[in-house]
Amino acid sequence: MDKIEVRGARTHNLKNINLVIPRDKLIVVTGLSGSGKSSLAFDTLYAEGQRRYVESLSAYARQFLSLMEKPDVDHIEGLSPAISIEQKSTSHNPRSTVGTITEIHDYLRLLYARVGEPRCPDHDVPLAAQTVSQMVDNVLSQPEGKRLMLLAPIIKERKGEHTKTLENLASQGYIRARIDGEVCDLSDPPKLELQKKHTIEVVVDRFKVRDDLTQRLAESFETALELSGGTAVVADMDDPKAEELLFSANFACPICGYSMRELEPRLFSFNNPAGACPTCDGLGVQQYFDPDRVIQNPELSLAGGAIRGWDRRNFYYFQMLKSLADHYKFDVEAPWGSLSANVHKVVLYGSGKENIEFKYMNDRGDTSIRRHPFEGVLHNMERRYKETESSAVREELAKFISNRPCASCEGTRLRREARHVYVENTPLPAISDMSIGHAMEFFNNLKLAGQRAKIAEKILKEIGDRLKFLVNVGLNYLTLSRSAETLSGGEAQRIRLASQIGAGLVGVMYVLDEPSIGLHQRDNERLLGTLIHLRDLGNTVIVVEHDEDAIRAADHVIDIGPGAGVHGGEVVAEGPLEAIMAVPESLTGQYMSGKRKIEVPKKRVPANPEKVLKLTGARGNNLKDVTLTLPVGLFTCITGVSGSGKSTLINDTLFPIAQRQLNGATIAEPAPYRDIQGLEHFDKVIDIDQSPIGRTPRSNPATYTGVFTPVRELFAGVPESRARGYTPGRFSFNVRGGRCEACQGDGVIKVEMHFLPDIYVPCDQCKGKRYNRETLEIKYKGKTIHEVLDMTIEEAREFFDAVPALARKLQTLMDVGLTYIRLGQSATTLSGGEAQRVKLARELSKRGTGQTLYILDEPTTGLHFADIQQLLDVLHKLRDQGNTIVVIEHNLDVIKTADWIVDLGPEGGSGGGEILVSGTPETVAECEASHTARFLKPML
């Protein structure tokens, strides 16, 4: 088989298409946003490839795998097992880091456990073995008469029942052993659980400390060391919590006797109690109630709400503050900022041991007086946060929590012992904090000698390979300790791609979703090289992509179209690029051949030096004290290679500051900065991202854009409705009354199938129409509410032409190019690009003040050349109303049409974080140091 044959694919909007795809080639699927590319690549080819592979497993194994729906297709042959690498958001687990996802951290743990050199944390000297005499002297230096026992560790944290071990010890004449911390008789040992980890230490000797024990102790120690293979523990018999003495014939600090357990990989894992920092449990950060978040506005008084929930509206807590004010002689009506530092301290952190007289009045007006210390607002919040069982209280209090690096482990996540093991004078945390490019250099230059070199050889090869793949997909600026939560979709996808190349599989079908997202043109070539490498191993690589270079690099291009949604779903052209360019109906072909192109604007809007937004001293992540100047009322692009600090500057600094000052938000905490000027030119800030407009099937474009309410009002105003007394609520499928109760207005019923994917069957009461029969009897211009929800935006625009409020909102959806989606289409079925355009349409339909600051992060994700043209028209329209638009973007077609560009760099990670140049595209294109300039110049 050298081809994959698809016959009769009808998934989503595909129109019964037939295709022959060559195997072991690089195939690019392209077309307008919403034309059916993902339906073909993911929901048909990948879903069927995965399903067939999973069907071959046992029913028991299948229930643990999330199965995809069986695609609606007549026949596919020539498929291989499929692996998809999607844009889906990364892990939200705070324990995942770049190092753990790529498995590099696992190999580093192994390396440090096998060839690391432990040192004493206090004296920084390598640990050396202790002799029996040293051990005896140490024990005899304990207070005389202290009852101690000498233990030999036999089994450390291993699963099993260990019956044989316990029988052997008893037969050797030992009477007691300490099992999982409890001392018990070996004649009647407890039954151990097979699946739990156990620790068994045999009691070799029990004694009271006195001077004439030297000979006896020396013999006991020799026995213990022989039994355990070189370690012994001395424990206090009277106080099980007392610190135990650890002895090692292997290594210990000669100065203070600090010794550590044998090095094992789990000592270097922050996800294992053996290695995690005990203070922060291996998270690297500690949560605390932040006074700056609790006191949002120091100009308010305590009575007026300086501390939310403690003002005069909250009677109970306000009584406490009044009693406190009487005791410390301060005024609850005075602004918080004017009160003394001592008052601040007492209110926030409590009165310590000092008793204060509190007057409490209950609902009936009875007063009681009690004397007790005041716990402090922050301690009160901490206590309520720990004790509460209500998720609402927890969520409310979580708004006041900030994170700070853990003081014990300084944010490295590891316990003290693990931080003091070195390979060539470098501890593990130092390697985790290196960028991937830097780490690769370190391992290339690492020279180990003798036996250690032999042990480390294989481990180093694995680490080196993985680092190389990450560098090849353009991620050399990330550090291994970077938390997975902070990665962008494109970065996470490329990390998964790098792990796949590391796996080195052959004969697999890879399906990728726009791997070039968030990647600067400079890094694009390396990414394409990686995809070609995957193909050359003998895999079929199918990529959904709009990037010009990717389309040119493909062996076979499939153009889906001609339009989007109901107007798409057909194969417009397929074959090598030349064949695509020759088809006049193919939009992709026309843009690729240059017959159509996005024009450079004839004239740009000039900047007004009087009106600027100026952010000074931004220092978040890798930013180096940056000063950003944005002209007000212009369309500005923020550019720079991946990792240069664009998102930190705009999403983590500018947006939260503006959100706090313009929208009055309290949650967003901006990255460190010195000052901001010029926000008076704006009345609000809006971030338009690609996150879904709703996470449930009940959200849809009609509810999100506010079209649904006037539609329901129209239906409620029909004479028949008025006669029956129907209100607009009758026409909502979210509340009782008008909806079909059998499916609760969903239109489908979910049937759980345990070994198969859950299936959704149309509700047999309403036949999938979501409403009950009576509601569907009401018609407006001959259509029922269900038929209206089933219209495309284009049809609805025509249908409601006479209703100006609706026509205007629907027209904006048309303007952003969403002519084809249905009014009632579930939000979960919209692509990221579509969701973003629904949000844009909602903004356009508002009566604008022309003073809004819009922030967009890579709006061209998922957009075809023709879609980008539409997006630019919308953004230019918003700008022409006087609004300011700031876009983070790599797409050169967008960059060349901007009025102003701010370019960050020169490199990613620690090599970036500076503003190289800002000005018009023509100015920026002349900058020698800028990578963006190199690619932008030919476009102008």
Curated annotation (Swiss-Prot):
Keywords: ATP-binding, Cytoplasm, DNA damage, DNA excision, DNA repair, DNA-binding, Excision nuclease, Metal-binding, Nucleotide-binding, Repeat, SOS response, Zinc, Zinc-finger
Chain intervals annotated as zinc finger (C4-type): 253-280, 740-766
Record-given protein name: UvrABC system protein A
Disruption phenotype: Significantly reduced survival of cells expressing DNA ADP-ribosyl transferase (darT) mutant G49D.
Residues the record lists as binding ATP: 31-38, 640-647
Entry GO terms, CC: cytoplasm; excinuclease repair complex
Subunit structure, interactors included: Forms a heterotetramer with UvrB during the search for lesions.
Family: Belongs to the ABC transporter superfamily. UvrA family.
Protein source organism: Escherichia coli O127:H6 (strain E2348/69 / EPEC)
Chief location bin: cytoplasm
Compartments, as annotated in UniProt: Cytoplasm
Domain ABC transporter residue range list: 310-587, 607-937
Biological function: The UvrABC repair system catalyzes the recognition and processing of DNA lesions. UvrA is an ATPase and a DNA-binding protein. A damage recognition complex composed of 2 UvrA and 2 UvrB subunits scans DNA for abnormalities. When the presence of a lesion has been verified by UvrB, the UvrA molecules dissociate. Plays a role in recovery after DNA ADP-ribosylation.
GO molecular function, one term: ATP binding
GO terms under biological process: nucleotide-excision repair; SOS response
One Pfam family hit: UvrA_inter
PANTHER family the UniProt entry points to: UVRABC SYSTEM PROTEIN A
